[in-house]
């Protein structure tokens, strides 16, 4: 549980020059944006200590040292072992501080997607999660992001999803399941769909939901609102057909071809009429499974936070 109190934070998304991937056209757009921001700040009186030099700097996952990735992974697990702030009367299924964030998203889903609040709400949401990791779990860094274009052609072999000890875990076991309909298209299933096969989150549990699972065999929640206790494994179907919608071209065009916030948010979130899931929907369906593929319950998969940190960056 967290409060949307007013907060002013100057955030700089760090580039990934030290990572193994060549910087692309989207990275170069960031360079232009930072130069414009620096010019803008230079014209303003320094009423506070905020500057590019003092700003929070978030890093791309592949540019983090292994020790930094492990620090983030361990902080996430510590948050999942801390007691919740929601009471059992408010959210009967919550069992951890991590679940607090999931419950908040479930309860507000319908007012924070496909509305004007989408970007601002999720920006603060990721910030609040980042602060919880730092203030409550001893995390020394800031929320990392995944630069989708680096991995869009082969997400399963990316440092995010390759399943090694410094990844966010990888795919789930092979389980037959349906594709993902979106407008006039259906994204075919990939080769997962079951419980995680390995990696640091293999034994991580989802406790809430499902509310709108795309998988038909997920045990139902005892409550209609999805807030009852329903412990189960994390399931994924890492899908390269979905990740095509997060490619360099899709991301670059999203930023450069939408001239107002309405068209930008609409294109980003997904346009059902044009059968385009957008980078937002494409990123979520790349993770897929349960809870990652559940519109309401997706934050219950820790990969959510890297995806939405990139939404913030974009």
Predicted regions and their residues:
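C-terminal accessory segments of proteins
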Residues: 19-314
């Amino acid at each position: 549980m967290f409060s949307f109190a007013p907060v002013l934070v100057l955030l700089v998304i760090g580039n990934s020059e030290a990572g193994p991937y060549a910087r692309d056209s989207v990275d170069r757009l960031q360079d232009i944006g930072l130069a414009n921001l620096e010019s803008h700040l230079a014209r303003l009186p320094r009423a506070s200590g905020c500057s590019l030099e003092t700003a929070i700097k978030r890093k791309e996952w592949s540019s983090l040292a292994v020790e930094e990735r492990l620090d983030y992974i361990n902080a996430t697990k510590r948050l999942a072992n801390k007691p919740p702030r929601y009471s059992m009367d408010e959210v009967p299924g919550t069992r951890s501080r991590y679940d607090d964030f999931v419950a908040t998203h479930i309860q507000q889903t319908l007012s924070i997607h496909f509305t004007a609040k989408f970007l601002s709400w999720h920006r603060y949401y990721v910030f609040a999660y980042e602060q919880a990791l730092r203030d409550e779990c001893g995390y020394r860094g800031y929320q990392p992001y995944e630069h989708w274009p680096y991995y869009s052609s082969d997400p399963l072999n990316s440092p995010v999803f390759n399943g090694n000890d410094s990844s966010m875990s990888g795919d789930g076991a092979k389980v037959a399941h349906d594709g993902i309909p979106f407008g006039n298209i259906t994204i075919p299933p990939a080769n997962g769909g079951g419980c995680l096969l390995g990696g640091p989150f293999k034994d991580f549990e989802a406790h809430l939901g499902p509310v709108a699972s795309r998988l038909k065999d997920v045990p139902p929640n005892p409550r209609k609102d999805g807030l009852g206790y329903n412990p189960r494994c994390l399931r994924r179907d890492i899908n390269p057909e979905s990740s095509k919608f997060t490619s360099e071209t899709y991301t670059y065009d999203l930023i450069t071809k939408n001239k107002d916030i309405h068209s930008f948010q609409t294109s980003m979130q997904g346009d059902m009429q044009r059968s385009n899931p957008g980078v937002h929907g494409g990123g979520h369906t790349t993770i897929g499974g349960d809870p990652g593929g559940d519109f309401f319950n997706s934050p219950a998969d820790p990969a959510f936070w890297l995806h939405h940190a990139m939404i913030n960056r974009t």
